[in-house]
């Protein structure tokens, strides 16, 4: 009889250990950010929530740039900084973030280029002390497909109309 009770107690103890991992997931911590990605058809940007685990602006900027360079788990989205060009460097100063990319950026289609800019700017202007984002191509000013200079941008410059971005 003692053996049966002992086996039952051992079983209950093991079961309780196994079930402790079945609870609800622990809440995410850190700064909640909306990360913007491009759908695979390259017709709109999609938002996904992420939590930054860093504190300083430089660390948050580095972490955000890593997110924007990494293809999401859902393969129906593309990372805006993983579209065939490289970020050479970036620098934040006085509320402005300047991103310098290689000349492969100039080979993006006009639609894709606007979506990439929208995703980058909408994401990065959520960081504290980043009010504007500028993009240069190998240290030269960026021009749009109409030949107009693209200067400092903020999130309000990009429309959001449920999938018809352009």
Q: What is the predicted role of each segment?
A:
Residues 2-15, 21-166:
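Bimodal "functional hotspot" detector
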């Amino acid at each position: 009889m003692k053996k049966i009770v002992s086996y039952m107690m051992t079983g209950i103890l093991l079961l309780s250990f196994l079930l402790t991992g079945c609870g609800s997931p622990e809440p995410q911590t850190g700064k909640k950010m909306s990360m913007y990605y491009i759908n695979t058809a390259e017709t709109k940007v999609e938002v996904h929530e992420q939590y930054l685990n860093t504190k300083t602006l430089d660390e948050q900027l580095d972490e955000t740039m890593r997110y924007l360079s990494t293809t999401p788990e859902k393969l129906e989205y593309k990372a805006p900084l993983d579209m065939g060009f490289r970020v050479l460097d970036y620098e934040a100063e006085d509320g402005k973030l300047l991103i310098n990319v290689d000349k492969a950026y100039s080979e993006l289609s006009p639609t894709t280029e606007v979506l990439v800019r929208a995703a980058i700017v909408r994401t990065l202007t959520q960081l504290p002390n980043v009010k504007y984002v500028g993009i240069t191509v190998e240290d030269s000013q960026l021009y749009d497909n109409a030949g107009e200079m693209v200067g400092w941008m903020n999130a309000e410059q990009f429309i959001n109309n449920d999938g018809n971005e352009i």
